[in-house]
Amino acid sequence: MLDAKLLRTDLDNIAQQLTKRNFVLDTEALSALEELRKAIQVKTQELQNERNTRSKSIGQAKARGEDIAPLLAHVSQLGNDLDAAKTEQDEVLAKIDAIASAIPNLLDDSVPEGKDEDDNVEVKRWGTPREFDFEVKDHVDLGFSVDKGLDFESGAKLAGTRFVVMRGKIARLHRAIAQFMLDTHTEEHGYQEMYVPYLVNAASLYGTGQLPKFGEDLFHTDLSNKKFSLIPTSEVPLTNLVRDEIVDEDDLPIKMTAHTPCFRSEAGSGGRDIRGLIRQHQFDKVEMVQIVKPETSMTALDELTRHAEIILEKLELPYRTVQLCSGDVGFSAAKTFDLEVWLPAQDTYREISSCSNMGAFQARRMQARFRNNETNKPELLHTLNGSGLAVGRTLVAILENYQQADGSINVPTVLQPYMGGLTNIG
């Protein structure tokens, strides 16, 4: 959420900055509500002052032996008027909050301007796509040929489209990928491994920015009077661990990682990526989250992005890093780098990680702060997150890049210890 003070004092400038995102802020509606809020606030204060004055006069009149019934009636009416004004004030504040909650984060000045993903800027390319001397198969055919290791038909029977059943060596390879990622992040990159709930409450989803705007992208449960949502990413529970907390400055940075399933309705995906693992309702991901001081967050973004890149390099998968343009940066982010891995069957790079600096946007929604050692005052934290990596898409990349002419799959060197020494599956 943006700073409420900025919305009151610098609304036109904020609206202008948001046009870079192709977001139109209704400044007239917000200004009108703000004027109404101020008028009601003045009215409320005047009623409060008058009631206090009249209440004091009751005691004085009683001491003089005067009839206080009219004064009591007046004070009672003032109380009713005050309650009505406070109700009106709450209604106006709720309307302002509804608008403010739907306003995306302001972009960092370094974000290139652009309309959509076509305007994203490539900043790095690593590895050379492999030249094949046989017809390349896609991961769907490759995975099924290994003992029906990728079984979309069974997934559809059990749940519906965009679900898969993995078995045998493919399931083991999927697990090995996640274990390798966790070990790298915890042993080499300094993250603490976490286990978190897969169901979260609305407050958590509001804190990281999924609610109220993106509720249709989530899977929700309704158990009597308890409502939960399945996590779309472990960014949600990990980041919300600091919600309503004041962290000691000496405990920063906080670096956490978790391997969880993620659940997404893919409400806006239409008919894209129906075939295969690229866009599933349920998929695994290893997430990285950093909680840092404001002045270190941009350096932390570079570090976080590098940690994701290292995973791809260890797996020897060609990739490129792109900086998202203003029209493609996500709702809560101030700056984002995407990593895209090479998929031979599609003859293109596809997103496998998104690494973002949220600035104070999520922290303000969560009231997540740290105590400044110099001032001894609480200040808003900065939050960052990134995929390190999407496990299913990494499996896709390995199957396609490591495929052999006979349909078998070579196992990347770094994964062989996790596969009991297997060098090839097929």
Curated annotation (Swiss-Prot):
Designated gene of the protein: serS
One GO-annotated biological process of the protein: seryl-tRNA aminoacylation
Protein name: Serine--tRNA ligase
Pathway(s): Aminoacyl-tRNA biosynthesis; selenocysteinyl-tRNA(Sec) biosynthesis; L-seryl-tRNA(Sec) from L-serine and tRNA(Sec): step 1/1
UniProt similarity note: Belongs to the class-II aminoacyl-tRNA synthetase family. Type-1 seryl-tRNA synthetase subfamily.
A Pfam short name: Seryl_tRNA_N
Domain writeup: Consists of two distinct domains, a catalytic core and a N-terminal extension that is involved in tRNA binding.
Lineage of the species this protein comes from: Bacteria, Pseudomonadati, Pseudomonadota, Gammaproteobacteria, Alteromonadales
Keywords: Aminoacyl-tRNA synthetase, ATP-binding, Cytoplasm, Ligase, Nucleotide-binding, Protein biosynthesis
Organism: Colwellia psychrerythraea (strain 34H / ATCC BAA-681) (Vibrio psychroerythus)
Residues annotated for L-serine binding in this entry: T233, S234, E235, E287, S387
PROSITE patterns found in the cross-reference section: AA_TRNA_LIGASE_II (PS50862)
Top EC class for this record: ligase
MF terms in GO: ATP binding; serine-tRNA ligase activity
Binding site for ATP: R264, S265, E266, E351, I352, S353, S354
A GO cellular component annotation in the UniProt record: cytoplasm
Keyword Glycosyltransferase among UniProt keywords: no
